[in-house]
């Protein structure tokens, strides 16, 4: 396990700061705001639950982000146990190439109640562009790099040539390839089942985050798991 505090990450924008305060407030080191009153107005409109936390840490200063809010936080302790045992699907991205798409997939995983988000390949899951794409929701679930050999549980690999998409078991590993390269040969060989999302004839692929979203919400809507402490319905942003 990595020690928190060895790596500091930048929280770009109000939503990233909001999610860090909501899910890991003890890790937030600093919040810089262009205007305290404007930042509090954002809290009142979008996240009243973090208002007092933001007020306690906010210091006025220059901010480049258009929301007028940015911050710094310690990277959380790395929880690798989710690779071996889980009560909700683990999203495993097979060598993603686009940091923003990987971040968007992590954002969906957090929203849908996945147990974690893991990346195969060379992309750092905590790269600033990945964190930006996830709107700071790295603090809501374990996010890490791993190898195929570390992963246990039934592996469901999404591929256009797979069998019709089934209901995912709660301990599933949902593997999604990159838009350009798809799934690697090693991943396909490791998969217990290769499955496909139903799509209109002539449509061959989906955006990475869209595919993750469709699969995870099919799992949720199937009633296989009753999520605890849901925050409610989605709000844009």
Predicted regions and their residues:
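RNA substrate-binding interface of SAM-dependent RNA methyltransferases
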Residues: 49, 75-162, 221, 232-234
